[in-house]
Structure formats: C-alpha cells, structure tokens
Amino acid sequence: MSTNPIQPLLDVLYQGKSLSREQTAELFGALIRGEMSEAAMAGMLVALKMRGETIDEISGAADAMRAAAKPFPCPERNNNPLHNGIVDIVGTGGDGFNTINISTTAAFVAAAAGAKVAKHGNRSVSSKSGSSDLLAQFGIDLTMSPETASRCLDALNLCFLFAPHYHGGVKHAVPVRQALKTRTLFNVLGPLINPARPEFMLLGVYSPELVLPIAKVLKALGTKRAMVVHGSGLDEVALHGNTQVAELKDGDIIEYQLTPADLGVPLAQISDLEGGEPAQNALITEAILKGRGTEAHANAVAINAGCALYVCGITDSVKAGTLLALATIQSGKAFELLSQLAKVSGEALVNGQERGR
C-alpha cells in the first residue's frame, strides 16, 4: 500500500474521473514543491488532457500556483479615485502563428491611454519573439524586483512581470512538458496566475473551444470583468476575421462575435501581421508606438488595446476603446512610456536595487 499522500488522487485521474478544485490544488501544490516524480507528473498531465480538464481542475491548479507565487506588492488600489483596478492583456500563446507582438505592444498603448496594466509574460511559445524577448530588446530588465515593478505600475501605469521570476516551482515541470511535446494544462495556466491579481483581463486563447471554459475559470477565480477571445486562429482579437468572445461582467458570461467593422477598422490579411526575430519585432513595435507603423499593425494593436480599455471601464464600448487607442498611438505617448520604463529599469539596476532578489 502506497504511503504517498498524492497517489490516491492520481489513481482517481487514472480511472478517468474528475478531481475537485481542492484536490487539484493539492496535487499541483506537491508538483510546485518538487514532491512529485517526473513519471507521476507526466501521468497526471496526460490523464487530465485525455479526459479534458474541468473548470474546477483548472481553477484548482491556478489556486496552487497563485498561492505559491512570489508576492507582488500592488500599489494601493484605493488611493486614487480614477484607479479602479489593474488589467492584464495576455494570450496563452501556442496558436501557431508567428505574428508581431500584438498584446505586448497593446499593453503600452492601453497604459498610455489611462489603464493600469500589469502584464504577466514569458518567453516565446508560438512565435519567434515572446513578450519577454521583445522587452529585452528595449533594455527592460525582465527580472526587476517586485518592488521596482510595483513602483513602475504606480508611476507609469505599466509593469511587466516575468513569469519564471514569480513562479519558481514551475521549473519542476519543464523537463516533463518538453518530453511530452503536446499541449497540457500548463498552456492555459500562465494567463491565470498573474501575481498582481488583476481585476480585469483581456485573455486570448489558442482554441475556440477554450473561450467559454476559460471565462468560467476567471469567474471562479474572482476576476471582476474579462473578455476571453479567440480571433480566427489567433489568441488575440482578430483583424483578419471574426473574433469569438466570452465576456464576464457582473457575474454573468455572455458570448458573441466581433468583426473588425464592429471595432471601427478595415479587414486585413493575417500575412500583414507576420513577425520576425526579436530585433525585427522591436523595430516594428517602436514604429507602431511612434505612430509610424503600417495601418494593419496599428489597427491590430489598437483593437486589442481598445478591448482592454473597454474591459477596465475607461470606455463604454470596444469601438470607443479602439478609437482612443488609435489616438494614443498617433500621439506618441505610448513610445514615451516605453522609454520611461526602460529608463526606470536601467536606473534600478545601476543603483543596485535589484540585488538580493
């Protein structure tokens, strides 16, 4: 008879049965603490994948990872009457398209337009250049301390939180994920475990089948308001076709579709949004933020920033949000913000504030 306390939970999964939210949190807690063998980890992830993860199981895994995360000292949420919450603009990755860095660039635009954006990101999943790869090109320190990141959020309306810096326990799963060579629950967990605990989210998913389930997970996790989107193959709001949406608002979830026309912009081709290596994508992002990007690039960023501005209540419609985002892009304010963030990041390193992290 096994003395391993998690073995009975694994046995439930191996029988094709579901775990409760609490049971899943217990399993993932063991994984994060390094108390699960790689064989058991692989068995757990495959068993969940083959049956299909439930809302409770995804929520429980997120609970465990949130609880184990390095704390993030959020700026006082109540000291500013205009500051009614933090928003994240994030995608699962894994959509298979090598696009420009839409959500990362949109984060600068939304912040310059007045949103408080704490973007949780990692290195590339589906493209040649993930959010962290891009930021490194601009000299933004990926591992700035939580205190420095919090100051950036307070002063500049924006910070970037590098996932491995806050979720050290995930390293135990890396060899297994690489060996399995298939999507697992970890592919959807990243956007759910932002240590800033954003009240608002624009969350893109790689599959249309995930849109409603992930909206239900966000509701279970206590997210105040969100749009979960899949845009004609992309984990973003689409410029090249329809976007499937599940919007969480006031505890209810409504499903609908958005077209580029609904957002006030013309249709474009997916090929117009093709990205490259980090250095090339950095030049593209810089051009967009200076108001000198191509129409398709500017519009793709604006519709995503616009939906984030709508979700956090700065505008009362996605179309109004897109118009505000386009005006912000043309003003050059978003590029000024990027320059300020890089400056603060560099000063923190020079002053030694990032030591002893």
From Swiss-Prot:
Q: Which pathway does the record list?
A: Amino-acid biosynthesis; L-tryptophan biosynthesis; L-tryptophan from chorismate: step 2/5
Show the SUPFAM superfamilies listed in the entry: Nucleoside phosphorylase/phosphoribosyltransferase catalytic domain, Nucleoside phosphorylase/phosphoribosyltransferase N-terminal domain
Name the InterPro entries for this protein: Anthranilate_Pribosyl_Tfrase, Glycosyl_Trfase_fam3, Glycosyl_Trfase_fam3_N_dom, Glycosyl_Trfase_fam3_N_dom_sf, Nuc_phospho_transferase
Where does this protein hold Mg(2+) 2?
Answer: 235-236
EC code(s) of this entry: 2.4.2.18
Cofactor note, please?
Binds 2 magnesium ions per monomer.
So where does 5-phospho-alpha-D-ribose 1-diphosphate get bound? 91, 94-95, 99, 101-104, 119-127, 131
User: What GO terms describe the biological role, i.e. biological process, of this protein?
Assistant: L-tryptophan biosynthetic process
Q: What residues bind anthranilate 1, as annotated?
A: 91, 122
Binding sites annotated in the UniProt record for Mg(2+) 1: 103, 236
Name the coenzymes or cofactors required: Mg(2+)
- Provide the binding site for anthranilate 2: 177
The molecular function terms of the Gene Ontology recorded here are:
anthranilate phosphoribosyltransferase activity; magnesium ion binding
UniProt keyword terms in alphabetical order: Amino-acid biosynthesis, Aromatic amino acid biosynthesis, Glycosyltransferase, Magnesium, Metal-binding, Transferase, Tryptophan biosynthesis
| Lyase among keywords | no
Tell me a GO cellular component: cytosol
Report the Pfam families cross-referenced here: Glycos_trans_3N, Glycos_transf_3
Reaction it catalyzes: N-(5-phospho-beta-D-ribosyl)anthranilate + diphosphate = 5-phospho-alpha-D-ribose 1-diphosphate + anthranilate
Q: Which family does it belong to?
A: Belongs to the anthranilate phosphoribosyltransferase family.
PANTHER family named among the record's database cross-references: ANTHRANILATE PHOSPHORIBOSYLTRANSFERASE
Q: What does this protein do?
A: Catalyzes the transfer of the phosphoribosyl group of 5-phosphorylribose-1-pyrophosphate (PRPP) to anthranilate to yield N-(5'-phosphoribosyl)-anthranilate (PRA).
Quaternary structure annotation from Swiss-Prot or TrEMBL? Homodimer.
User: What name appears for this protein in its UniProt entry?
Assistant: Anthranilate phosphoribosyltransferase
